[in-house]
Amino acid sequence: MRKPCYAVYHPALRLKCLVRKGLGKIKGDTDMCDKQQLKKKEKEKQRAQKVACGPRDPPCTFSRSYTDQKRKEIHLGSTEWGLKESFTLTRGPNRRGNVGKGVKRPMVNKKLGQLELTSLDLRWQKEGKGN
């Protein structure tokens, strides 16, 4: 009879994986664990990632709803600076023909230069006189 898998701390392999009986287990200790179960779990993970991104999309950094939400936030915030253009994402699952063009936006102020929004992976492009 096989022993059930327990969560074992292995100093060399700190990866925990869920296996038989739903308990955490280290990948290295296969004597007690079911290898097949591990493979199944990994395959499921990979499949889930493929479905999320779609076959031909670039590797997506954010989900579609997240980017839409962020875009709204940025657009709302942009009115404070007097920017009238909304922003478009250059990378991600919902880009349309604007690959590598950067994001066009008006110059706010010569001193301010480019607004840095670190929360999203966006590239800005200066536009207007004075650059």
Swiss-Prot record:
Disulfide bonds: none annotated. Keywords: Meiosis, Mitochondrion, Nucleus. One of its GO terms (cellular component) is mitochondrion. It is found in: Mitochondrion; Nucleus. It comes from the Eukaryota. Transmembrane segments: none annotated. One of its GO terms (biological process) is meiotic cell cycle. Has a role in meiosis. This is Meiotically up-regulated gene 115 protein. It comes from Schizosaccharomyces pombe (strain 972 / ATCC 24843). The gene is mug115.
